[in-house]
Amino acid sequence: MEDVCTECGFDQSSTPAADVGPALERTATEVADAVRSVPLELLRRRPEPRTWAPIEYLGHLRESMAFHRWLIEQAVAQDHPEVPMVDPDESVAAADYRGADVEDLLGQFHRRVMRLGAHLAALPPGAAACSLTLGDRPITVALIARSAWHECHHHLGDIRRPGGL
Ligand SMILES: [Zn+2]
């Protein structure tokens, strides 16, 4: 849950939540283009045993977009709720994305990005300051929104890497 990342060069710590939706949608389009550009023989292959295949990064992002929207809903609907941390490695392994249809996943990812963007655009005044505790860390709606964008930006690099794009 970050809005500054030295690894991928992302720094949107001053971007207001209201501006995140359109930017997220643009980055998500780049993700979809990158996935479609990965050579078929590399799409489902892990470069190393502990590094996800490109299609697994897409599956993770599909989950991540729904999770971020759900977190924002919880933070706005309740008074600083506590939400347990999730393990992305576990859920990606359980979903078996390497056996999934890539166009199905791209469609689901796109719909979840659009839903998250619409949700951000419709946030009531002051909602960006609503907060929750994820694991042991207090976070605001504004950070959750920027973090969703960072997820796409960060994994765009992971998806491009194995194909050398
Ligand atoms: Zn990053």
Model region roles, listed by residue range:
Residues 37-42, 121-129, 164-165:
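Surface-exposed helix-capping loop/turn segments at secondary-structure junctions
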